């Protein structure tokens, strides 16, 4: 079973449709079963897609309408044209750059029962610090799972920012019974206080990079990007946390310009499980 995650920075890159296609090609070639996407954008002013046309879409109870330029919607359409059908969910987190409805997406080979969990102190959709995390239950080759696609805030204090958001998510996930897969952009580099909150969580999860039998690459950001304007280091801020009982065969950084082209200001991860 393979997992894939990437912060897509969608519609903000040069040649965005080419980059969308590159993401879809790797999903196909890797035969990934579950995919988590962050910074999945659609324009506020673009045309809505009628719900009846979204045949494999799994909405949340308070679903934001899907628009025809929704980046995840277009990826799913591309995959379907190639004969691979994915169920998917998406929900807006906040308005980005004044023109986009920005959110998180999940794709699965099986139907998703999804919800968006507000984890930030801010609740205003126009505030880029408002964070909603997409949480879903789905079947997989490893049984029923709870999967998360998340894009979190930066570290501020032990009571605000990332720390506050992680506490909200942690409390919510602790009520569940299924094995947990948490994928996404934590905005907290490995080894820092924010990362240690997750590493030391009472949730039964482990960092795929740490436990993998084989690793190819490590960092997922290697330059100055939005939110890391002063960065000059290679950072590991995108993660895959998997159930403690799972065996990780390989952790691979993708979309980094080596075997696969750069498609975003973040690199992606491909996790191969035994």
Curated annotation (Swiss-Prot):
This protein's record includes keyword Ion transport: no
Report which reactions are catalysed by this protein.
Answer: alpha-maltose 6'-phosphate + H2O = D-maltose + phosphate
Q: Which GO terms describe its molecular function?
A: hydrolase activity
Disulfide-bond pairs as recorded: none
Q: Pfam families from the entry? A: Exo_endo_phos (PF03372)
UniProt cross-references to CDD domains, sorted A to Z: RgfB-like
* UniProt-listed InterPro entries: Endo/exonu/phosph_ase_sf, Endo/exonuclease/phosphatase, TDP2-like
Q: What happens when the gene is disrupted?
A: Cells lacking this gene grow significantly and reproducibly faster than the wild-type strain on glucose as carbon source. They are able to transport maltose and grow in maltose-containing medium, although at significantly slower rate than the wild-type strain. They seem to accumulate primarily maltose 6'-P when exposed to a maltose-containing growth medium.
Entry EC no(s): 3.1.3.90
* Swiss-Prot/TrEMBL keywords: Carbohydrate metabolism, Hydrolase
Work out whether the entry's keyword set contains Nucleus. no
The record, for PANTHER family, names: ENDONUCLEASE_EXONUCLEASE_PHOSPHATASE FAMILY PROTEIN (PTHR15822:SF23), TRAF AND TNF RECEPTOR-ASSOCIATED PROTEIN (PTHR15822)
What the protein does? Catalyzes the dephosphorylation of intracellular maltose 6'-P formed during PTS-catalyzed maltose transport, leading to the formation of maltose. MapP connects PTS-mediated maltose uptake to maltose phosphorylase-catalyzed metabolism. Is also able to efficiently dephosphorylate turanose 6'-P, and to a much lesser extent, leucrose 6'-P and maltulose 6'-P. Cannot use glucose 6-P, fructose 6-P and sucrose 6-P as substrates.
Protein name listed in UniProt: Maltose 6'-phosphate phosphatase
């Amino acid at each position: 079973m393979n997992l894939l995650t990437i912060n897509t920075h969608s519609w903000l890159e040069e040649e965005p449709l080419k980059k969308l296609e590159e993401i879809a090609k790797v999903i196909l070639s890797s035969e990934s079963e579950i995919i988590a996407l962050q910074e999945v954008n659609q324009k506020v002013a673009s045309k809505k897609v009628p719900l009846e046309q979204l045949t494999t879409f799994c909405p949340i109870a308070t679903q934001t309408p899907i628009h025809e330029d929704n980046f995840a919607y277009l990826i799913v359409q591309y995959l379907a044209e190639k004969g691979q059908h994915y169920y998917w969910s998406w929900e807006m987190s906040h308005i980005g750059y004044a023109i986009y409805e920005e959110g998180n997406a999940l794709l699965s080979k099986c139907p998703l029962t999804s919800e968006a969990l507000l984890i930030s102190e801010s609740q205003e959709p126009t505030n880029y610090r408002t964070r909603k995390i997409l949480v879903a239950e789905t079947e997989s080759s490893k049984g029923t799972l709870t999967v998360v696609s998340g894009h979190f805030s930066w570290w501020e204090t032990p009571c605000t920012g990332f720390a506050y958001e992680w506490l909200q998510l942690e409390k919510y996930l602790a009520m569940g019974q299924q094995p947990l897969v948490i994928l996404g952009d934590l905005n907290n580099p490995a080894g820092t206080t924010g990362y240690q909150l997750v590493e030391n969580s009472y949730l039964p999860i482990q960092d795929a990079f740490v436990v993998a039998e084989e690793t190819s690459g490590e960092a997922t950001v290697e330059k100055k990007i939005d939110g890391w304007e002063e960065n000059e280091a290679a950072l590991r801020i995108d993660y895959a946390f998997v159930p403690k009982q799972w065996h990780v065969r390989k952790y691979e950084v993708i979309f980094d310009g080596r075997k696969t082209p750069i498609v975003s200001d973040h690199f992606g991860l491909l996790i191969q499980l035994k």
